[in-house]
Regions:
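Long extracytoplasmic/lumenal interhelical loops at the membrane interface
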Residues: 136-198
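Transmembrane alpha-helices of multi-pass inner-membrane enzymes
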Residues: 227-240, 244-286
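Flexible juxtamembrane loops connecting transmembrane helices in multi-pass membrane enzymes
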Residues: 30-31, 104-108, 120-153, 173-176
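Hydrophobic transmembrane alpha-helices and their immediate junctions
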Residues: 62, 99, 198-236
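Membrane-interface junctions at the ends of membrane-embedded or membrane-associated helices
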Residues: 1, 56-64, 96-105, 219-221, ...
Length: 286
């Protein structure tokens, strides 16, 4: 499953790269990211793939190139969610690699200290130029952003219909949401989506789902399942500003498939221990 997430992320990254190759002249005019319809979906796929790439980087340092590629393509999508959550996930993934390699930690600390200031300086110099097309009055996030309106509307819908919400098929929010034909009304926020469209029933259902998944990850905890946990966390993050986990295909399906794989992992207490090691369990890919 980690290979699937990894391959999907690389494929998405190459799709984004191909888009810029085909529109290179327009990009070179001011070096600002260009709009394309599937940028938020691309950001979602790249974000959940970062932990998978980090898992392989923990075993083979050549995969750090993929981690860098996925993060750079996240920036090139022009998604503000990709920028904010992608940077957070990159740091978590690097911390994961650090944790998985006790014998290399001294080396990683030296590299981190040497590269920290140049990396931050590069990001500060690069982001305003790349995201110039997304700026409103010099701010990356405007107080008038429609996501604020969606979130408030979700709370209002919950107050009006606290038990079941307004329903997934309700179109009464159409004036503030211009979705594609056949789509439900998205609130672009996980909390607002559950409260506004499903009410307390949705809170109980999704609350139990979250509890069950976290409990499963804890019971099966290992370096492999930690990578799955990071991918799940990435999906939860992107769901705070995009449809994310509420899209049945492929987002929700990927999460279901991922937890099927996690469920087939051995329980922590049952993981065999390597000969000559009293505390380090053997880590398997599947």
């Amino acid at each position: 499953m980690l290979q699937i997430l990894y391959a999907g992320g690389l494929f998405t990254g190459f799709v984004v790269a191909l888009f810029y190759v085909r529109n290179l002249q327009e990009f070179l005019q001011d070096f600002a990211t260009l709009y394309f319809k599937y940028r938020n979906f691309s950001a979602t796929m790249l974000l959940i793939a970062l932990p998978a790439a980090a898992y392989f980087a923990a075993h083979d340092r050549r995969h750090f190139l993929s981690v860098a590629f996925l993060y750079f393509m996240l920036l090139m999508t022009g998604s503000r969610s990709g920028l904010i959550f992608g940077t957070a996930m990159l740091l978590l993934c690097l911390a994961y690699v650090y944790y998985c390699n006790p014998e290399r930690r001294a080396f990683y600390r030296r590299v981190g200290l040497i590269s920290l200031i140049p990396a931050v300086a590069l990001l500060i110099a690069l982001v305003p130029r790349l995201f110039a097309s997304r700026m409103v009055d010099g701010a990356l996030i405007s107080p008038d952003d429609s996501r604020y309106t969606f979130f408030i509307q979700g709370l209002l819908d919950f107050v009006k219909n606290p038990l079941f919400g307004c329903g997934l098929g309700s179109m009464h929010n159409a004036p503030i949401f211009l979705g594609v034909e056949g789509s439900i009304v998205w609130y672009h926020n996980l909390i607002a989506q559950i409260l506004g469209s499903m009410g307390l029933v949705g809170v109980v259902g999704y609350g139990w789902l979250f509890y069950d998944r976290v409990r499963l990850l804890w019971r099966k905890r290992s370096r492999t399942t930690m990578a799955f946990a990071l991918s799940y966390f990435a999906m939860l993050l992107i769901s705070m500003t995009n449809p994310g986990m509420f899209c049945p295909m492929p987002n929700a399906l990927l999460m279901v498939a991922m937890f099927v794989v996690v469920e087939r992992q051995p329980d922590t207490a049952a993981v065999p221990v390597k000969v000559g090691s009293a505390s380090t369990p053997e880590r398997r890919l599947f």
